[in-house]
Amino acid sequence: MSKKTFQPSNVKRKRTHGFLERMSTRAGREIVRRRRARGRKRLSV
């Protein structure tokens, strides 16, 4: 039986999907902008 593919790590999670990571690229800022416009409670992880 193979292992589960999801091995949670809060460090990896923040580093790849965190707010600062989003703001560091133009595409990331676009994501945050869209989520704001849509009224999301959480903009990023």
From Swiss-Prot:
According to the record, the residues making up region (Disordered) are 1-45
Please indicate if the UniProt record lists Ribonucleoprotein as a keyword: yes
Q: Where is the composition biased (Basic and acidic residues)?
A: 18-31
- Disulfide connectivity for this sequence is none
- A single BP term in Gene Ontology: translation
Question: What are the Basic residues biased-composition ranges?
Answer: 32-45
Q: Does the keyword Nucleotide-binding apply?
A: no
- The name of this protein is Large ribosomal subunit protein bL34
- According to its UniProt entry, this protein's organism is Syntrophobacter fumaroxidans (strain DSM 10017 / MPOB)
